[in-house]
Amino acid sequence: MVYGKLSTRGSEEVFEWNHSYSKIYQPKVKYNPKGVFMYFENYNVEVRDRVKCISAIEVGVPVSTQWDASGYFYPIQIAQFGLSHFSKNLTDAPPRLVILEDGFNYLADWVSAEKSHFKRRKDGSYRVLEFSVKDRRMPGVVTRVDKLHPSLLILQCALRMVGNGSLVIAVEDKDRGFTYSLIYTCSQELLTVNGNDVIYGIGDCPDQWHYLTRDLAIDLLKGHVVSGRGKKISRTRLRLLSLTLKGEGQITNLTLRSSAHESQFRSAAEWLVKHQDVVTGGWPIPVRRRFGPGIQELNPGWISAMGQGQAMSLLVRAYNRTGDEAYLRAALNAVKPFQVASAEGGVLARFMNMYIWYEEYPTTPPSFVLNGFIYSLIGLYDLLTVADQFQSVRRIFDAGMASLKKLLPLYDTGSGSTYDLRHVMLGSAPNIARWDYHSTHVNQLLLLSTIDKDPILKTTAQRWMNYMKGKKAPHN
């Protein structure tokens, strides 16, 4: 099978073809842990089918349905969410934004119905809009936003509810021909749909401030998926109509933006700090993982070297960005599982009892997944750039790089690469990496070749790129 597209070269129209559907990103400069992470500025974690929604309860991070349809917090997915938004924050244009209400300088045009009222006042260090709508059947306190630029689909605010209040955004979906209500309310229910109402719980509301950053297009999309209305949405076909306050509470710093990458990457970094097991240094994965015949399944609570590595990459960037030592402490603590055998709850394995390996899946017998191992090495390298005085981190990184260089040939099929080494460990057929994983291998090796000049990294990457063009290793 070949893949391709029509393009123009000079005055001629040509068909550019490839044996692969994946893209290679040639690094132009040496990899920098203060900059974009690989090519993650092109990632959009939120739209993935395996993301149930972005939690409004747990500081705005994705909830995964991979391996468990009920949904759970998957550290790898959360780290990738943070890394993608960190990278977009560096590459995207500055956002459009409109401050609607801050209680002082920016005052929205609110309208209150019968038995509803609002007023502005100072509350501690905040200037706030205080509202009271005691009869929830009434329209509430409303402001229109239908004249604003259509790209302003990110909502941010500080919201404090007294009792069971809610913030309601009316959104017109022109493709479906309906208006939907996005409702953020005091509840522990993650996401529910009732007709055209898409309801997100923001947790219990014991008269405390909630700081929301919500991508309204994504929130509506996930509601459509739950209700069976389809898995696609066009941001350009959405129009915000109004914002409504119900119940009793206060709101301030109410803003609509075209993007909020800084807040989103920080949400992921803060989640990692908050949910790290301080004893083990890991982010336990709370689901059972079945890996395949001949390999024992992983029980809930396993730790992934890939998760540890990508978390370190995000935490180092958050530390570089903010100077907050909490991020650095968490990144350093994340090294602990690299020193504990995978059979004992860590991620450390050995190939043929000789070569160190850090397991994406700490299976018995070891599985030696390539892409997850390399992501762990990138995370260790990132950490070394801010903590090179820690010799244990240096030893762990150097041992991993030495193993990678020795074992890379075992992943080469002559026409592609393998995902892992089960063909060696089990004597089974090789687990051939599909093209998107193969291209990930290539992109990872190209990145490493900018920080380590050993020719095996660059030459292997080049050979594996040629496989994507249909070239194969010669036969005898």
Locate the predicted segments by residue.
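Long, well-ordered core segments of solenoidal/helical folds
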Residues: 3-13, 18-68, 164, 172-175, ...
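Exposed low-complexity, polar/acidic, P/S/T/G-rich flexible segments that act as propeptides
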Residues: 238-263, 285
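Short carbohydrate-recognition loop motifs
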Residues: 111-141, 185-187, 192
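Structural helix-adjacent loops and short alpha-helical linkers that scaffold large soluble proteins
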Residues: 88-98, 222-224, 257-267, 318-333, ...
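Extracellular carbohydrate-recognition regions
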Residues: 7, 19-21, 94-115, 257-259
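Extracellular ligand-binding interfaces
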Residues: 132-138, 148-222, 248-250
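Carbohydrate-binding/catalytic loop surfaces
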Residues: 44-69, 281-302, 348-371, 413-440
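Well-ordered alpha-helical segments within folded domains of soluble proteins
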Residues: 74-89, 302-319, 367-384, 433-449
